[in-house]
A protein has these predicted regions:
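Glycine-rich, often acidic-flanked micro-motifs
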Residues: 3-42, 52, 217-234, 245-246, ...
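A short glycine-rich, hydrophobically flanked beta-strand micro-motif that places a catalytic Asp/Glu
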Residues: 106, 213-220
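Conserved lysine of the Walker
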Residues: 239
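Hydrophobic positions on the alpha1 helix immediately C-terminal to the Walker A/P-loop
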Residues: 242
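Generic C-terminus detector
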Residues: 484-527
């Protein structure tokens, strides 16, 4: 049931609002139905449409430039500066818009390690946005509500549109972080991922700057012997899918911290998974998690409420959010210890990288700072086919600091712990076909269980990665060498060189070398 406590929101500038405070998942589900803002799928999940925006809008993400951020944030096309005065005026407009409305307030927190707990209060215009916050943030006990004090405030108003000429935004929608006032202000977009990624970006600044902790855009799980594995990768590369392993306990699927005390903790209390082409056979854990309490976004259903996950009429970026306990085998407390294996997941649009290769510490640091992958259809506005990109730290869109800052921290962690680092291509081979999920799982299982420790390896030309020549459970051993999937071997060599050159060009264009250590530079391709 909802909490009986009355919550005053006047202190935020919201006047005469009807406040629905700390509603349960069932109540928010019913509110969404009653207001005709969603429909119930046959699975019991609520299905909603996020409106005009079905993905993040990176060009409309801003950080207030002030005394805390001006000399620390890596300003540019990713971290776009916003004037403090403009923020204050826009905030006043948003809270005036929410005044006299029925609004929803949820209190939760991020960072599962108690030492790093950060309280989040989320104020939303819509009930399903509040259900998203309930699903995605860690849940607090009712006994904590009376003494709850937020460290960050999220204000989410999809129905409010900015006036770019007056408000300083690019267009009507915006997502702005203010590190002095600790407010994430979101307007003009109903895409729920802006709530999640706003707080993720905030932690990606605060944890390294103030808490000496490495934030990571990754999933993580734990084996039966307590061995932690980390999976880095951009949206659509397989983080959520590959970390949902029936033989391992899930710590989390997207955002984690790696502490000086050698813990790896989940930031979140839920999962936000892509569901395009989802089947119970391919991804049984995720499929089973879609039940009452979950939110399906922008999917197509028949008149009986059965979802057709193959349909992308609205967007390629169909999604589900659900609380982590919808997954059967989760790690108690969402905390693990130093990882034994790290996997960099990349979608190689060139089709030249092998399905798995082992990296030296230097290569790992270089690959991490480079963050090569392809933007997969639907995850951002306007992306309909895979496009080559370099997203530093496998999550540049959410990283306020210079990539070298994060790269330095990861390199130190790798050296301290001796962790194995693997590059996994979940994208194309030479036939422009994706490696099957079954084969990718077999490769990762082999790495996790030590079955790749004593096999023969060969070097990938130019890059120098170690490529295993055999792997138990893979349907066709020949695919382990990416060259074998190309009919034209000369074209393979040319494309491999072209990709290597693009790595070097990216490093030069972004001036990464200026902040990178000699170890990182030693991991570059040898042209």
């Amino acid at each position: 049931m909802s909490n009986s406590k009355k919550l005053a929101v006047d202190k935020y500038g919201i006047k005469n609002a009807t406040v629905r405070y700390q509603l349960s998942a069932d109540e928010l589900h019913q509110e969404t139905l009653d207001k005709k803002l969603g429909v119930e799928a046959s699975s019991g999940a609520i299905a909603i449409n996020t409106g005009k925006f079905t993905g993040r809008s990176p060009k409309d993400r801003f950080i207030v430039k002030d005394d805390i951020t001006k000399d620390r944030v890596w300003w540019g096309n990713i971290n776009i500066p916003f004037e403090p005065e403009k923020f204050d005026k826009l905030y006043e407009k948003v809270v005036a818009y929410l005044s006299s409305k029925e609004i929803y307030v949820h209190d939760g927190y991020v960072c599962a390690d108690p030492k790093y707990r950060t309280n989040i209060r989320t104020i939303t215009e819509l009930p399903w946005s509040n259900l998203f916050a309930l699903n995605m943030f860690l849940r607090i006990e009712d006994s904590e509500l009376d003494s709850f004090k937020e460290d960050w405030l999220v204000v989410n108003a999809p129905g409010f549109e900015a006036d770019p000429e007056v408000d300083g935004t690019r267009q009507a929608n915006f997502a702005i972080l203010n590190f002095t006032k600790k407010i994430a202000l979101i307007g003009g977009t109903g895409y729920t991922g802006e709530i999640k990624k706003g707080i993720f970006s905030a932690m990606n600044f605060e944890l390294p700057v103030f808490r000496n902790t490495m934030p990571m855009h990754c999933s993580a799980n734990v084996g039966k012997d307590g061995d932690t594995a980390i999976f880095f990768g951009l949206s659509g590369t397989g983080k959520t899918t590959l970390s949902a392993d029936p033989n391992r306990h899930l710590i989390g699927d997207d955002e984690h911290g790696w502490t000086p005390e050698n813990t790896v903790f989940n930031f979140e209390g839920g999962c936000y998974a892509k569901v395009v082409d989802l089947t119970a056979e391919k991804e049984p854990e995720i499929f089973a998690a879609i039940k009452k309490g979950a939110i399906l976004e922008n999917v197509i259903m028949d008149d009986k409420g059965v979802v057709d996950f193959a349909r992308t009429d609205i967007t390629e970026n169909t999604r589900v959010s659900y609380p982590i306990y919808h997954i059967a085998n989760i790690q108690p407390g969402s905390i693990g210890h130093n990882p034994k294996n790290i996997f960099f997941l990349t979608f190689d649009a060139y089709g030249v990288l092998p399905p798995i290769s082992k990296l030296t510490p230097e290569q790992a640091a270089y690959q991490f700072v480079s963050g090569y992958t392809s933007k997969v259809a639907g995850t951002e506005v306007g992306i309909t086919t895979p496009q080559k990109t370099f997203s530093a730290c496998f999550g540049a869109a959410f990283m306020p600091l210079h990539p070298a800052e994060y790269g330095k921290r990861l390199a130190e962690k790798i050296k301290e712990t001796g962790v194995n680092v693997w590059l996994v291509n979940t994208g194309y081979n030479g036939k422009m076909k994706r490696c099957s999920l079954k084969d990718t799982r077999a490769l990762i299982t082999a790495a996790l269980t030590g079955k790749l420790n004593n096999v023969e390896y060969k070097d990938l030309p130019i890059f120098g990665f170690k490529v295993p020549q055999s792997c138990e459970g893979v349907s066709d051993q020949s695919i382990l060498n990416s060259e074998n999937t190309w009919e034209d071997k000369a074209q393979f060599s040319a494309k491999l060189k072209e990709l290597a050159e693009s790595f070097v060009q990216n490093f030069n264009d972004k001036k990464f070398a200026e902040g990178a250590s000699a170890d990182v530079l030693a991991g570059a391709p040898k042209l």
